[in-house]
Design a protein with these regions (language model features):
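Alpha-helix N-cap and loop-to-helix initiation/capping positions
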Residues: 33, 37, 69-73, 102-106, ...
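Aromatic- and acid-rich polysaccharide-binding/catalytic face
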Residues: 59, 87-99, 122-123, 129, ...
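An active-site-proximal structural segment forming one wall of the substrate-binding cleft
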Residues: 80-91, 100-129, 144-161, 182-199, ...
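Aromatic-lined carbohydrate-recognition surfaces of secreted/lumenal glycan-active proteins
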Residues: 145-146, 150-186, 234-255, 280-294
């Protein structure tokens, strides 16, 4: 790897691509079980997807409000994350908050420790995960999500600036058509100018045709979801159009009657729909979920989200995504 070409990570215009580097079992243990990651195989696949472009590697750390949090940052976890940042790749590092006690002081300390430990490897730092999802795996299950975001974004922005680090800071959500949703109402009531000034992006996780079968055209569905998110949800709460949208998670699992060819088509059509909306809606990033299956033999859809099988052999969608990165990425 030492002789590999390094791709500078900067703020040029265009879509920045990425992928969650594991399987569902590594990110959400209650949704799937499977084989452990093989870092060498992951890096091989990431090199192929990246080509000569910038590339993000999405991964997750969880804050629980216990002594384990300090251990998480001080353990040899750092090499486990840094080893995927060859050739100029950066982490899209998600800090989930699973603390039921709403200990903001400990949350701030956790964010500061993560930045001190991982800062140079981070391209995007996401504060909380799916805070408007009130069931597993969303952070909305635990309460205080809005305070965790408002405080966390400002603290992270300040600490990165103090260290002269250029990572972007933001939060994400899942689609919501309810104008009275408590999360967004609380965001609108509590956010201030300092928060908006510290906010580099708002992310969206969305999975058309997964939990709910899609009726109609995929590109139209992507367009509808993203347009509503920008022009209704974000506008309604006062987040300006100058704040970019990141597509943080988007994917389609294979399985019985869920064919590899359909997954490849999903990736192609979804990415091109996002590209078509990039200028109009100020979308700057697209990240696929996820790189490999948790367990290719398991027919449950949560086990087959990958564009690689669990033995790291490619499905057709892998080459489709690689070609899209080469064509549309920066």
């Amino acid at each position: 790897m030492s002789g590999a070409k390094i791709i500078p990570f900067n703020s040029r215009g265009g879509l920045r691509f990425g992928v969650y580097m594991g399987g569902v079992s590594e990110a959400h243990h209650e949704l799937a079980t499977g084989k452990p990651d093989i870092p060498e195989e992951i890096n091989r696949a990431l090199d192929l997807l990246q080509g000569d472009k910038q590339f993000l590697v999405r991964t997750y750390l969880g804050f629980t409000g216990t002594e384990q949090d300090a251990e998480l940052v001080d353990m040899p976890s750092m090499p486990d994350l840094a080893r995927y940042t060859w050739r100029g790749r950066k982490l899209d590092l998600v800090l989930s908050n699973w603390d039921r006690c709403c200990n903001l002081a400990a949350w701030v300390e956790f964010i500061e420790n993560v930045i001190a430990r991982y800062g140079p490897y981070i391209g995007c730092l996401q504060i909380c995960e799916e805070p408007n999802l009130y069931d597993y795996p969303g952070d909305g299950r635990f309460g205080c999500a809005v305070d965790n975001i408002l405080t966390g974004v400002k603290v992270a922005h300040q600490k990165l600036k103090q260290r002269a680090l250029s990572a972007s800071v933001g939060f994400n959500a899942v689609p919501c058509s309810d104008p009275n949703d408590g999360f967004w109402r609380e965001i609108a009531d509590k956010m201030d100018t300092a928060f908006i000034n510290a906010l580099d992006y708002v992310g969206l996780n969305f999975y058309p045709d997964v939990a709910v079968p899609l009726v109609g055209d995929l590109a139209k569905e992507v367009t509808s979801v993203l347009t509503e998110f920008r022009e209704e949800t974000l506008r309604h709460v006062g987040i300006p159009g100058s704040v970019p949208i990141h597509i943080c998670e988007n994917g389609w699992p294979t399985g019985p009657y869920r064919y590899y060819t359909r997954q490849a088509e999903f990736v192609e059509r979804s990415v091109r729909a996002v590209q078509d909306l990039r200028g109009k809606l100020n979308i700057t990033h697209y990240e696929l979920f996820c790189l490999r299956d948790a367990d290719t033999a398991n027919p449950d859809l949560n086990h087959q989200f990958g564009i690689l099988r669990d033995d790291y052999s490619p499905k057709p969608a892998f080459d489709v995504y690689r070609e899209l990165v080469a064509e549309l990425g920066v």
